[in-house]
Amino acid sequence: MDGSMNLGNEPPGDGGGGGGLTRQGSIYSLTFDEFQSSVGKDFGSMNMDELLKNIWSAEETQAMASGVVPVLGGGQEGLQLQRQGSLTLPRTLSQKTVDQVWKDLSKVGSSGVGGSNLSQVAQAQSQSQSQRQQTLGEVTLEEFLVRAGVVREEAQVAARAQIAENNKGGYFGNDANTGFSVEFQQPSPRVVAAGVMGNLGAETANSLQVQGSSLPLNVNGARTTYQQSQQQQPIMPKQPGFGYGTQMGQLNSPGIRGGGLVGLGDQSLTNNVGFVQGASAAIPGALGVGAVSPVTPLSSEGIGKSNGDSSSLSPSPYMFNGGVRGRKSGTVEKVVERRQRRMIKNRESAARSRARKQAYTVELEAEVAKLKEENDELQRKQARIMEMQKNQETEMRNLLQGGPKKKLRRTESGPW
């Protein structure tokens, strides 16, 4: 395999026999009737959130039953994975039922005018099928999800293909002619780690076209048929680069940097720092991307639009319901804990008040008993004093009288 590979300038290919969402042995090639009969559920009344969860469960069951393990060094044979890429559901569709979404798609197909939630590719498909109106049971899961605007992350599949093709002397091999000249705008810790781990040579410098990890690619690196049928204005214009010939592996590959969250690429690779082999620190500078082709975003609700609006790329609410519930439960726990502490404080305060009241009552009772005893003692003393005073008065009267007085007698009445 030639070391110089430009993922964006390769001739269009069939992608190993499968463009779009499906591959051989995929669940997405089943129709709704087949999927409902195999699962045993009615998906018409389910919302899109529950439909995706059922599809993921069926994927996991199929992967466990098949027992296929991805092999990095096995070429295209290692790509026969039963587990598909993750799906990104727009916020406007997460709570709609499957019947409602299908009615909207049917209306768009009959009128020929696309709504805000449908891409131009879905409009073209609906117009081509306007001659014969399909039912929901005849539509495959792939067609339904594409027309509804659900986005697939197939960049990781392309990354595995590149790893399988370059395993002989690529990212972690010992060949020295497999480096690529990567020129991007800001460093990422994953890029630094990959640059340290890789055995980078210094013989040749090859250009690597940087593409978003959310753009679906075929096995040979070409764009899918959906992207070939529609070209839009690029979100990021081409910028001049300085061409540092750094012998590095495909550090921008989604297999190395792991892709982003829910269809988003690693945005840290679009910053303003470049790396040079053998340098002990990063060299800041406005480094561009060599041979950058215009990025063609997939026209859907889940990925960027023509005006660069990426508000719909935010993750769906159902993916973070656990975090919201955790915050709510934490708040409730705090309120309950605060209430319990307040109740404990009130109980302790009431107990202290009762103890003070009881102690005060006991003290008052003791004081009353003491006062009663003192009163009785004083009354006894007063009685004794009164008796003594009475006796003294009687004795004083007797002493003052001194005995019986003599009576005056007339002994002689006269001289005669």
From Swiss-Prot:
Changing S86A: Abolishes ABA-dependent phosphorylation. Residues 13-22 have a biased composition (Gly residues). The modification Phosphoserine is found at S26, S45, S86. Residues 1-23, 300-326, 388-416 are annotated as: Disordered. InterPro entries: bZIP, BZIP46-like, bZIP_sf. One of its GO terms (biological process) is positive regulation of DNA-templated transcription. Changing S26A: Abolishes ABA-dependent phosphorylation. Disruption phenotype: Defective in glucose response and grows faster. Exhibits abscisic acid (ABA) insensitivity. It is found in: Nucleus. Residues 336-399 form the bZIP domain. The modification Phosphothreonine is found at T135. The activation by phosphorylation is induced by abscisic acid (ABA). Phosphorylated by SRK2C, SRK2D, SRK2E, SRK2F and SRK2I in vitro. Signal peptide: none annotated. SUPFAM superfamilies: Leucine zipper domain (SSF57959). SMART domains: BRLZ (SM00338). Residues 364-385 are annotated as: Leucine-zipper. Changing S94A: Abolishes ABA-dependent phosphorylation. Expressed in roots, leaves, flowers and siliques but not in seeds. GO terms for molecular function: DNA binding; DNA-binding transcription factor activity. Belongs to the bZIP family. ABI5 subfamily. Involved in ABA and stress responses and acts as a positive component of glucose signal transduction. Functions as a transcriptional activator in the ABA-inducible expression of rd29B. Binds specifically to the ABA-responsive element (ABRE) of the rd29B gene promoter. This is ABSCISIC ACID-INSENSITIVE 5-like protein 5. It comes from Arabidopsis thaliana.
